[in-house]
């Protein structure tokens, strides 16, 4: 009898939960339609994997890519609509958030072709890999639209948990296991620090969790200049710092880049920074509106340390992936300049434009690392010597992406940095921009050093890896080369038409 009553209560509770979820989707589903497409894609992947055999593997890639492209399309159709707040204030839809969601979807769409041949060669489980990538993308999209402290804490956990699993996907590799352990420990510590900072905001604002309501609560309680807000600022900056990985919160980055599967590194190198930048800009601008001088100073210190340490340490690296890890630390220093400038002087527009170019430059470089690693089994920088003699297309594509990362004209990276630094200069960040210019020159040195190795024709300098280099049949690598071509074009052509891109970003944001 007791069991029967408990069973009925369980059914009633489950029914209420289901009806509430159905009600939320019915009345708020249009606000998260791009996210719903990804959820539907995840369900399809699970259904096909559980009911089919190995012959249906191409369908898994097709469904993953199609769901991402359809999500991008839904996002573009919703462009320029009026800002909307849904799910009782937990989620906000506006042009600013949608731009970051578009960048995350673009990253994932370009990363899936990079993983096709790699997964086949390493015999990794395909379905789980695609599920983790799509779920991480979904978490990043929810993070971009988060409008309260709880969602800002929960959404990155969805992204982070999938990132931990992806970084340790090659479980037989000792380096991958070590990278996952460090990533998990550092990620868990940063999450606890972040939520502790939110607890200070919650208490100081009188129990508010929505970002704008936190500001109103701080005004009502007269706590906007209290020591508690300073403590919250420090903890939240540290928590977000571990997600963005600027110096000195970069300790996990080189090991994770070196030990994780290369397609995973390509995915994490761009999506993690885009996903963390969106809430960072909103948190600093809204709840800490009255502490702008303090957080400007904190971010300036982080930017300077990142640009100097990242680019100087990158010079000494012998592994291509570790070099790109330290390079990414320097790159986030440039992005922080745009966060500091903010709405004034087109800071956000220049930051978003540079992020768009950075995605193409970085993914193009990682596409080359994936191809070279599969054909030679190494990512040592010295082993790239003489690659031009064996594979001119791969060498030239790599050179263009590296030159664009260094910021040489007339490539996209040059114009992206130029506009970003110009916005910083107009905002009075003279010292910060000067450091950025100097460290950009330093980065050009180690990028040119790699290009020199790629183009060398001296037989005594060509390594055995390149001598034995054999191109795979075009059928097996066309997806990687297709992604590389797209990234190379995006790293070069937009530099010529920079003004229209900046104008579109400015017109969309403001």
Swiss-Prot record:
EC number, as in UniProt: 7.1.1.-
Catalytic activity, reaction form: a plastoquinone + NADH + (n+1) H(+)(in) = a plastoquinol + NAD(+) + n H(+)(out); a plastoquinone + NADPH + (n+1) H(+)(in) = a plastoquinol + NADP(+) + n H(+)(out)
Membrane topology note: Multi-pass membrane protein
Intracellular or extracellular location(s): Plastid, Chloroplast thylakoid membrane
Enzyme class: translocase
Domain of life: Eukaryota
UniProt keyword NADP, yes or no: yes
Gene Ontology molecular functions: NADH dehydrogenase (ubiquinone) activity; quinone binding
An individual GO BP term: ATP synthesis coupled electron transport
GO cellular component: chloroplast thylakoid membrane
Keyword presence, Disulfide bond: no
Pfam families named among the record's database cross-references: Ndh2_N, Proton_antipo_M
Parts of the chain that traverse the membrane: 24-44, 57-77, 99-119, 124-144, 150-170, 183-203, 229-249, 295-315, 323-343, 354-374, 395-415, 418-438, 484-504
Record keywords: Chloroplast, Membrane, NAD, NADP, Plastid, Plastoquinone, Quinone, Thylakoid, Translocase, Transmembrane, Transmembrane helix, Transport
Family: Belongs to the complex I subunit 2 family.
Function: NDH shuttles electrons from NAD(P)H:plastoquinone, via FMN and iron-sulfur (Fe-S) centers, to quinones in the photosynthetic chain and possibly in a chloroplast respiratory chain. The immediate electron acceptor for the enzyme in this species is believed to be plastoquinone. Couples the redox reaction to proton translocation, and thus conserves the redox energy in a proton gradient.
Assembly and oligomerization: NDH is composed of at least 16 different subunits, 5 of which are encoded in the nucleus.
HAMAP family hit by this protein: NDH1_NuoN_1
Annotated protein name in UniProt: NAD(P)H-quinone oxidoreductase subunit 2 A, chloroplastic
Annotated organism of origin: Drimys granadensis
């Amino acid at each position: 009898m007791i069991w029967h009553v408990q069973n009925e209560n369980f059914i009633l509770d489950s029914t209420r939960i289901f009806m509430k979820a159905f009600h939320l989707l019915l009345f708020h589903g249009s606000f998260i339609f791009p996210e719903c497409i990804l959820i539907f894609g995840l369900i399809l992947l699970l259904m096909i994997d559980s009911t089919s055999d190995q012959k249906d593997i191409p369908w898994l890639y097709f469904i993953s890519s199609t769901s991402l492209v359809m999500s991008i399309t839904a996002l573009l159709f919703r462009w320029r609509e009026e800002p909307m707040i849904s799910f009782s204030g937990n989620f906000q839809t506006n042009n600013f958030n949608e731009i970051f969601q578009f960048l995350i979807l673009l990253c994932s769409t370009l990363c899936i072709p990079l993983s096709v041949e790699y997964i086949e060669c390493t015999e990794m489980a395909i379905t789980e890999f695609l599920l983790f990538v799509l779920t991480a993308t979904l978490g990043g999209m929810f993070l971009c639209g988060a409008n309260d402290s709880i969602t800002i804490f929960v959404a990155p956990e969805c992204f982070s948990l999938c990132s931990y699993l992806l970084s340790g996907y090659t479980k037989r590799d000792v380096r991958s296991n070590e990278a996952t352990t460090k990533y998990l420990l550092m990620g868990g510590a940063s999450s606890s620090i972040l939520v502790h900072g939110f607890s200070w905001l919650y208490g100081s604002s009188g129990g508010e969790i929505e970002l704008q309501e936190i500001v109103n609560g701080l005004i009502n309680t007269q706590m906007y200049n209290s020591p508690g807000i300073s403590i919250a600022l420090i903890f939240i900056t540290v928590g977000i710092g571990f997600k963005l990985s600027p110096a000195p919160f970069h300790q996990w980055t080189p090991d994770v880049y070196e030990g994780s599967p290369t397609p995973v590194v390509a995915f994490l190198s761009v999506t993690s920074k885009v996903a963390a930048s969106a809430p960072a800009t909103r948190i600093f601008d809204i709840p800490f509106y009255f502490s702008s001088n303090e957080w400007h100073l904190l971010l300036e210190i982080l930017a300077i340390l990142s640009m100097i340490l990242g680019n100087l340490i990158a010079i000494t690296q012998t592994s291509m992936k570790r070099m790109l890890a330290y390079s990414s630390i320097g790159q986030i220093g440039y992005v922080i300049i745009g966060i500091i400038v903010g709405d004034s002087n087109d800071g956000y527009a220049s930051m978003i434009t540079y992020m768009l170019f950075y995605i193409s430059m970085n993914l193009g470089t990682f596409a080359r690392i994936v191809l070279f690693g599969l054909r030679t089994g190494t990512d040592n920088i010295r082993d790239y010597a003489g690659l031009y003699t064996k594979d001119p297309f791969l060498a030239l594509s790599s050179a263009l992406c590296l030159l664009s990362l260094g910021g040489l004209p007339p490539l996209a990276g040059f114009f992206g940095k130029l506009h970003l630094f110009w916005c910083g200069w107009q905002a009075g960040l003279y010292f910060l921009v000067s450091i950025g210019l100097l460290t950009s020159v330093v980065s050009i040195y180690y990028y040119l050093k790699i290009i020199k190795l790629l183009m060398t024709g001296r037989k005594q300098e060509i390594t055995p890896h390149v001598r034995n280099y054999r191109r795979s049949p075009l059928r097996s690598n066309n997806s990687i080369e297709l992604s590389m071509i797209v990234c190379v074009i995006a790293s070069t052509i937009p530099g010529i038409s920079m003004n229209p891109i900046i104008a579109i970003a400015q017109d969309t944001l403001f």
